[in-house]
Amino acid sequence: MSEEMVYFSGLSDALRITFVQMMILSAIAIVIFLYGMIITLQKWGSGATGYALEPQEGKRGSAITFLKTWWKQVTEKSPHGHGKPILEILILDILFQRRILKRSGLRWVMHILIFAGWMTLFALSGLMFSVELTHMIGIELPFTPHMFREWLSIPNYIFGYILLIGVLIAIVRRLFVSEVREASIMYDWVLIGVVFLVTISGFLADGIRTGLIWDFGLDPSLAPPAALFHSVISLLFCIAFIPYSKYIHIIAIPLALLANKGGE
């Protein structure tokens, strides 16, 4: 296997993880995610109306039935007369989150930073994967995966900091804004802490490897296990864990907004 197809992650410098091994880990995370989504859609299809709520007694849900019903609601005319065009909902309500902006400017900034950072980093990872896969199956590209990874380093840093700022705002709000602090439970802190850990571990892994900013004088030999730790917890909490936690709201809220035509 070429040098470009060996990752920074590994148990040690001599035991680096390979593309195939990373794809196996990714596939496991995706299977766990899909299984959780099927269970969640079945619950929604049988009448469950919120996170951690069970279906109506005696009803067996169907993910396909739920999706058909949801699509029918999306495409039919709103009976309440408040329906907005789908494109407007996608851009203003889902992408730019104007509903949150109407309620709180600081909360909106926090959500936008976390959303933009998280989703862009996810998209950049997808781009990196597509280049590596293309290279692996033998399709010629005008650049190597290693070159492409270096090109992505700056946007990865930029959107990593965007995500970090958003998470720090979330932490500050829960510490110093009384109504937010009083409404927070330990589970909310765990979810924020997980995103913070994923973000910081990424900076640390890169800093130890490059010796820039985030290395904190740590031994460079720690770079592979640090990168492996970041990769594993990213797959676990940013993909696999979503349907089993309150992270599901990043899927549930857009679905509800589209089904309600932007209505409350």
Curated annotation (Swiss-Prot):
One annotated GO biological process: methanogenesis
Enzyme class: oxidoreductase
GO molecular function: CoB--CoM heterodisulfide reductase activity; metal ion binding
Cofactor needs: heme b
Transmembrane segments: 19-39, 109-129, 152-172, 185-205, 222-242
Record keywords: Cell membrane, Heme, Iron, Membrane, Metal-binding, Methanogenesis, Oxidoreductase, Transmembrane, Transmembrane helix
Cofactor note: Binds 2 heme b (iron(II)-protoporphyrin IX) groups per subunit.
Topology with respect to the bilayer: Multi-pass membrane protein
Record's catalysed reaction(s): methanophenazine + coenzyme B + coenzyme M = dihydromethanophenazine + coenzyme M-coenzyme B heterodisulfide
Gene Ontology CC terms, in alphabetical order: plasma membrane
Assembly: The dihydromethanophenazine:CoB--CoM heterodisulfide reductase is composed of two subunits; HdrD and HdrE.
Protein name, as recorded: Dihydromethanophenazine:CoB--CoM heterodisulfide reductase subunit E
Lineage, top ranks: Archaea, Methanobacteriati, Methanobacteriota, Stenosarchaea group, Methanomicrobia
Gene: hdrE
